[in-house]
């Protein structure tokens, strides 16, 4: 019946993580906002696929996010709907997914994202061009040393090829103190207290006014369990920040108030993963490269399909997690497979079946010229809608 999903496992995973991490973390963040007279602010990025799973298995998480949204101290960022690698594999698919995600966020929370956060903070000059064309004012990415050199990540930068697109760069030290080292008993700074953390931020060089702490949401309650003190640590941050004249800002607020100090050039995609800060965790071996190639080969035909099930399966097949599970670089804590080869075999079996379904609708015998003509029409319609929306917004201002 071409049904590829383990609904029982999906439900178990989502309900478990919602109970251990999402709900207690959201309650803590809401308390931080209310207890500190809206001094604390936070931005969220949720993929469309993630939102769909929450709608099915943990709708209380979305209700709590809406409650946070109503405080005015929260910003929702745009990203790819499928948490995919479309930005480096298929520009048209990337644009379609971002538009789809923006509509989903707007429908749920009543706000249209102004700032973009790509899957795993992946960024390059070419990607910045696509993000600019989609109408975003800024983007979040990694403050990779091999890109920055002597420069500090603690400023606003701009895209080298689209200077109108502003960039916020992740501060590795202050992000990973929380996401990786917080519960490391061998770390010289252990135990990390809110006082110590804020004092270290205060000690950064004068003029470096923006510290971007980006982390996986599961840091709160899952990667660091409640008994590590992670929730108490977070709850204490606003009061120590205020004592040290450190404020919290949303990405769009920073972009509105701050001019870029310089541009950065990133000819090859970088990410926030591993020491290399590249894309090798998803595309570093032949298994991953073959799966990604095979996936992208059929994208044009899928975009012409009207079948709802094919469209849905296409989105879920593009999740970057599938490729991450095939990585041979390191042990994968979150993989449901015993090894990368099982992950590859299962994915390719599903993808092969999916390709047969697509071929039944648009056989490979159809000439590429005919396909391209249809796709160009669809693409032009999408671009025209984006242009008209921009004109409408400008007229409202």
Q: What are these model-predicted stretches?
A:
Residues 87-89, 147-155, 177-179, 260:
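Short, charged, surface-exposed secondary-structure boundary motifs
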């Amino acid at each position: 019946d071409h049904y590829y999903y383990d609904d029982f496992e999906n439900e178990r995973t989502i309900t478990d993580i919602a109970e251990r991490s999402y709900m207690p973390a959201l309650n803590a963040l809401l308390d931080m906002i209310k207890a500190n007279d809206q001094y604390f602010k936070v931005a969220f990025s949720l993929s469309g696929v993630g939102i769909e799973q929450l709608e099915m298995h943990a709708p209380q998480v979305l209700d709590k996010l809406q409650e946070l949204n109503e405080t005015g101290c929260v910003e929702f960022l745009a990203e790819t709907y499928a948490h995919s690698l479309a930005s480096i594999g298929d520009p048209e698919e990337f644009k379609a997914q971002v538009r789809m995600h923006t509509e989903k966020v707007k429908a749920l929370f009543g706000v249209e994202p102004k700032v973009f956060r790509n899957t795993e903070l992946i960024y390059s000059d070419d990607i910045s061009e696509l993000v600019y064309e989609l109408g975003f004012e800024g983007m979040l990415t990694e403050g990779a040393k091999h890109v920055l050199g002597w420069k500090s990540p603690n400023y606003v930068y701009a895209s080298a090829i689209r200077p109108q697109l502003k960039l916020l760069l992740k501060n590795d030290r202050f992000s990973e103190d929380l996401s990786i080292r917080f519960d490391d008993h061998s770390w010289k700074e252990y135990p990390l207290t809110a006082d110590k953390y804020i004092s270290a931020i205060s000690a950064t060089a004068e003029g470096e006014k923006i510290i971007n702490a980006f982390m996986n949401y599961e840091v709160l309650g899952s990667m660091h369990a409640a008994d590590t003190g992670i929730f108490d640590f977070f709850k204490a941050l606003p009061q120590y920040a205020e004592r040290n004249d450190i404020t919290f800002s949303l990405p769009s607020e920073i972009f509105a108030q701050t001019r870029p100090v310089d541009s950065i050039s990133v000819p090859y995609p970088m990410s926030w993963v591993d020491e290399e800060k590249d894309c090798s965790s998803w595309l570093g071996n032949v298994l991953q490269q073959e799966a990604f190639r095979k996936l992208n080969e059929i994208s044009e035909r899928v975009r012409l399909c009207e079948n709802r099930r094919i469209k849905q399966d296409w989105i879920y097949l593009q999740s970057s997690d599938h490729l991450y599970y095939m990585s041979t670089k390191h042990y994968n804590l979150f993989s449901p497979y015993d090894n990368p080869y099982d992950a590859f075999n299962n994915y390719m079996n599903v993808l092969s079946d999916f390709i047969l379904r697509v071929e039944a609708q648009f056989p490979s015998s159809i000439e590429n010229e005919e396909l391209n003509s249809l796709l160009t029409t669809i693409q032009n319609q999408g671009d025209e809608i984006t242009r008209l929306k921009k004109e409408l917004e400008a007229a409202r201002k």
